[in-house]
Amino acid sequence: MALKKEQHFFKGMQRDLSVSKFNPEYAFDAQNIRITAREHDTLLSVSNEKGNKEIPLQSPSGDPVVIDGVLLGQNVLNNYVTLFTKGTNDNIYRLENKGTYFETLILFSGNLNFSTDYPIESISVYENNNIQKVYWVDGLNQARVINITKDDYNNADDFDFVGTIHTSSKIEVSKVNGSGAFGQGVIQYAFTYYNKYGKETNIFRTSPLLYIAYSDRGASPEETVSCSFQINFTELDSSYDFIRVYSIHRTSIDATPTVRKVADLATDTKLYVDTGTTGEIVDPTLLLYVGGEEIAPYTMTQKDNTLFLGNYTLKRSLISTELKNQIKSDSIVTTILGGLDDAIESEWNVNTQYNSNYDLNYDSRIKGFQKGEIYRLGIQFQDNKGKWSEVVFIGDYECTERFKYTQYDTYGITLIPRFKVVISNSTTIQAIKNLGYINARGVVVFPTLEDRNILCQGILCPTVANYKDRLDNSPFVQSSWFSRPKQATETWKTEYSGTNHLSEFGEVPYFQHNEPIGSASLSEITRWEIQTSLGLVPYYNPSTTNAKDFVDGSPSEFLVDENIVTMHSPDVEFDDRLQNITNGKFKLRIIGTTHLTNTLSDISVITSTPTYGNYATGFYKGKVANMNISTSYYGGRQLSAGLFWSDNVKFQDPSPQDKLERLWMVYPWHRNGSLMNMGVPTEGTRAAALQRKIISNLKFASQNNYLPNQSVWEAEISGDANHTGITPVNSWTEGLVRIPAQANSNLGSLNYYANIDKVLTFNRSEQISEIYKNGYLIYTTKDWITDGKIADLFNNAISQTISVDQVQDWLTRIADTDKYGTEPVSMKYKSNPHLVFAFNYTESGKQLILPMKNNNNGYLAPSANSKPFWNPTAPEGAVYQDSINFTNENRAFFWLAELYRDSVVNRFGGDTEEAILNNTWLPSGDSVIIGDSINIEYTEGDTYYQRYDCLRTFAYTNEDQNSIVDIVSFMCESKVNIDGRYDKNRGQVNNLAVSPTNFNLFNPVYSQKNNFFTFRTIDYERFSINYFPNSITVTKEKSLGEDIDTWTNITLATTLDLDGDKGEIVSLNTYNNEIFCFQRRGLSNILFNSRVQIPTSDGMPIEITNGLKVSGKRYISNTIGCANKWSIAESPSGLYFIDNETNSLYLFNGEIVSLSDKLGFRQWISTHNVHVNWEPVGYNNYRSFYDKNNNDVYFTYKDHCLCYSELINQFTSFMSYEGVPAMFNVSSEFYAFKDGKMWEQFAGDYNMFFGEYKPFSITFVANAEEPNDKIFNTVEFRADSWDSDNLISNKTFDTLDVWNEYQHGTTPLTNLLGHPSPLKKKFRIWRANIPRAIANNRDRIRNTWAYIKLGMNTPNTYRTEFHDAIIHYFA
């Protein structure tokens, strides 16, 4: 056999090759050696590893510091190292590199809920010298952040992204008139806390809606109001630096509001006044996401100052179905009236009711709940983060109380109906608290128009009918020009009795059913309305008279109809939806009365020609009404006809008396002619010719009187033959309204007009008296006016009738033509929006009409054999009228009624689980603290109780000869904010110029609901999952140095779901400014900022969501992934990771390369493969670190550490860094942290690791000339050792091991000069004999291959450099 040799020089380490195929350029095993250069020129030569040295940890005062506990995570930011440990306490340390030591400061020690099973992943951001932040996640707790330059942390929750609110603060907002500047509308305030450069909490408190309006009226949509809002703070949370005030300002109803960041105030602030001139406008959607969601992410990364978080758990638990059912069953619901000590009361001085009864100076808590209406009630709970839970449905409840007026001292106060919910079950309350909830409040689903029981509330007024028009149905009835209240006490004359009307308080009498409007009685002339009307009763004898002849002779006659009525409600006037009702099917009930306490009247008369007398007074108004609305018993009277013209009498034969003045009658509907007794002249002009006359009456009712439940009058009673309901309801229109035929009436559909333009002619009728055959009489006072003294029209509260008389025939000096009037009357007027309907007839065919009070006679009854001219077949006693008995003040009144439904189908969408899920819930009041019981008041409803000035009648045009303005002012429940009117004509004495263009100008924004924040119930079975392992969420883009850290606001507005078949998200990593996501069986690229952002139309930047920037994902591999994120290490060359599913160690740098397969370590990885995550105590999987200074990657396990060099792209050695929890670069140095101590790598003695000697060795395979058998003889190697810089000539390796599959030999390598020894050196080459097999110490190592190991086991600190080895063998 010849002696041969095989040379080995090493460029790496491999393990997978078969021993027979092993490459001599690779080591099979290496321990604590380097093939790359460190301090010397040793690249591709083997050198032993230089060990580490401990770096002292000192406090700022120089005292040594001991790190407490197990290291869970670390972060390096410039010269700072942040350590997170779990020990006696949970600790956060900041270590500042001072060169020779680390100055160590404990930033926090306490309970942070750290766990060794949940190591910490972190990233850091340097913003400026004062703001250097470390963000961390652990998959157990919510995401957290610490500014490591700050050292005054006191609370464990100071670090949470979603902050805890520690106190139950009280915040009250009130309006101050007269300073500041706000655009009209409504405003609401929302409040958050924040720390400077840190997090902002959720909105923990919101105010009710406040009204931006003048002190006595609303504002027009274009107006700016001078007012401000005072905010009072009590017990703010001092753990925060600031409280931030937001305003939500709407200038039109349900429009996108203007949201303003008003002010940032120190938390010791007690008072702030918002004048509307400060602050910054922000995106309205900001408030929907402010504070963010509390999630516990497992991994995170960042790109372009945007934070990505993946595999997260929602920390806020849903309320279970069982607990919801328990809350519902334990809730005791009642209806209450807000008491005198409530924060908001609708109040006014009883002596100045009109001006003070104005609710816009308060807030939206003026709204209550409407009696008889059904509301869907729920409860929400607020946790200590300020976040509100999903809604817990309590049930559908009817409000059983009504707004109640009561007098308190000198003030009248309206008590507001509200719901109250009480929960007293201690088990239920504790279960609520166990979920972290501390507050509760009420929420409501308010009924929509379609869901409402009550369509509207308002007063009922009779209609009027012209005889001729009624017979022709052209129209059958028309809107009454006067509102015609019911009288308190009246005895009415019958058709032939001749009894005068008795009116104790001077009311106008012609308001009862079927009564003619007019009279031949001079004692009632001041209450006449139509100059050409004679008061012909509407009954006739069909057997002797033809109905057509009857009405043809009565073209100017009108009657009052209480069977067909109009309903006047603010909901109809101000809600467009109620102005389009056609044949709506509703029911009617009378719930009370509104009593008139005063009337404000005025009149204006303009003539086109002068007075007849040269010096006559002409228009004389006198005293027509009180000048204020203080309460009285005379509210039922009004201005109708009166002696308003003072002029001479025209005689045929002039005499000295013709210069004496008399007062002349002026009527609401006055003739087209002279205001005195001048007829049509044969030549010249007519004196005192009427050009324009306006009469206005504002009837004022201070309060309502509600009937007890048992006295409420129903138009329809099941099984009652006399109460058969009402016809379908129609809304007012400009033109014809057709009232459907009344049941049991034998009549067809009836025509109705609200707006009238007609001319009334005189019939020269003799049905009343022969004296009228030539015309209607012209009336004047009987006596002359002397000394310029004219009596007031209403000079006596008891009897307001002024003595009048006709011009007697014996005054022969008056021409016959001047005793009578024959000119027609122009009747033109319009009505505001209202509803019209008729009562169905009784089953016996009688007219059902409005009820009377306390059995007062309420209608004109026909005599025997007479019938209504429009219904000759009417039964005996053609009218049916109920009487409602109640005790009240003796005042004129209107019936207060409601249109309602009692069979609403699928209210709120139904009561199924699905319907409840689809409901939108609005908050109804502030929160209350959850104590031993829960007491919730629903302080914000949907119903206003306010004054409605109903403009019933107004001028057709401004040029009409006769015009009437009729207004009824009364309190009413409404779904619209009536006080939102912005005209200046409220409560005026003079209403002559009033029309819809300047009266009741309504700004709908004041009816705005508190619906900026809306809520829903949640299907627990569907949404109880709070773990989202395959989801990524993205924050907004962060600006360095911003006051509030954007990254702390996790909105979940943008999420990206990855493929579920690839397992949960394990790690998010950024490489080359691209985000990559590892799943157990997949690797994907998250496409972020891959296309141009698109700005919004108004130029505002995209906020809240980066939805246009995250465009999806692109999978790089559907099979290769990573289950243990701690095995991932990032370097400029790529991402290193171990896939426990495929048993490989990979490098990803645009493509995935298996380094373990390529470089011969697949089997090694497979042998140590486990399917558990790394954690610092058990260390049962790999933890990877990257040394950026030396381009080495360390794959660390609990019992070994594999090093990969990027310089040579090879695995180089196993290092004694096993079980090290952290290795990191600080500046240009590389450090390791182990056992509570900091170690600087490569700064200690050679072979000394963490204060202990660790051997080094290199193992290779000699397998030349395979498959020939060989006898291994000697090994030669070139190697040198140094002690510092001193060459040691007799030291290299101290052990040689050789083995194959059946032999093993070992020998110590000692070099004895001059003596035989296993190791000899000649010409700088070391030679050693291959040891014999230790089995018998005789056999040579013989095989086709052999493992050769050179090692140094003797403790020393020498540097050794090994160049190559040559194996001599016989073959």
UniProtKB/Swiss-Prot annotation:
A single GO cellular-component term from the record reads: virus tail
Q: Where in the cell is it found?
A: Virion
Main localization category: virion
Q: Which domain of life is it from?
A: Viruses
Asked if the record carries the keyword Transmembrane helix, the reply is: no
Keyword terms, alphabetized: Viral tail protein, Virion
Subunit field text: Homohexamer.
Q: What does this protein do?
A: Forms the muzzle assembly at the distal part of the tail. May serve as the gatekeeper to control the ejection of the cargo proteins.
Q: What is this protein called?
A: Muzzle protein
Taxonomic source organism: Bacteroides phage crAss001 (Bacteroides phage PhiCrAss001)
